[in-house]
């Protein structure tokens, strides 16, 4: 996901060649990073449906390549899609809404397949925040192809905006994921963008 956002060649041979050129020419690119509850992340962090899928993906790691996340989504949908009432504060603006997922993105891609936040940029000093309202199983399935293409953001169930700082609170702890790794459930998620935090050879 992060490689896609960076524009790095996907082939390891081409990536190594690009790295060699970058080293020789001393090319650097400063990009943003994120912090969530005191911990660093590079690509994205979220609570709700995305975190449930990440947790389920750990149970199907034996599947090859990009099949793990669709299989994990199928496992999650067997149980149904839960939603929670959230209180969200973004750069001082407060909203209270029911949501099945809140994901804060530094990069544009998630889960190897999903163009979850098409406008996201690694060097704009902002996080792209995607909120999904309560969804039925059937609606999730109809939105999956759109999420792969990045057209889901036009759906009425999706809200997209940018913020430098974000606080999400829920009455009960929800599953959390950061950069595709499951973390302990939380009832408060404090997220911020740290501009130009990383220097990469390009």
Give the ranges of each region predicted by the language model.
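Hydrophobic alpha-helical segments that either span membranes
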Residues: 1-2, 102, 128-130, 140
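A generic structural signal for short beta-strands and their flanking turns/coil linkers
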Residues: 82-84, 98-100, 123-128, 162-166
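Catalytic core of DAGKc-family lipid kinases
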Residues: 1-100
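Gly/Ser/Thr-rich active-site loops/lids in small-molecule metabolic enzymes
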Residues: 59-68, 109, 113, 118-139
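ATP/nucleoside-binding phosphotransfer catalytic cores, i.e., glycine-rich phosphate-binding loops
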Residues: 90-91, 121, 131-202
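Glycine-rich phosphate/pyrophosphate-binding beta-alpha loops
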Residues: 46, 103-116, 182
């Amino acid at each position: 996901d992060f490689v896609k956002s960076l524009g790095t060649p996907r082939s390891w041979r081409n990536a190594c060649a690009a790295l060699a050129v970058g080293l020789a020419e001393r090319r650097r690119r400063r990009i943003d990073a994120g912090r969530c509850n005191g911990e660093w992340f590079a690509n994205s962090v979220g609570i709700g449906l995305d975190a449930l899928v990440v947790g389920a993906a750990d149970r199907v790691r034996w599947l090859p390549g990009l099949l793990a996340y669709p299989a994990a989504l199928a496992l999650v949908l067997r149980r149904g899609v839960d939603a929670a009432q959230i209180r969200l504060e973004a750069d001082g603006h407060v909203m209270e809404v029911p949501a099945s997922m809140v994901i804060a993105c530094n990069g544009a891609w998630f889960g190897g397949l999903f163009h979850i936040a098409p406008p996201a940029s690694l060097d704009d000093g902002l996080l792209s925040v995607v909120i999904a309202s309560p969804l039925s199983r059937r609606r999730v399935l109809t939105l999956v192809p759109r999420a792969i293409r990045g057209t889901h953001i036009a759906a009425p169930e999706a809200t997209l905006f940018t913020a430098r700082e974000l606080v999400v609170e829920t009455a009960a702890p929800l599953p959390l994921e950061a950069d595709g790794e499951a973390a302990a459930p939380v009832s408060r998620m404090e997220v911020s963008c740290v501009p130009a935090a990383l220097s990469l050879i390009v």
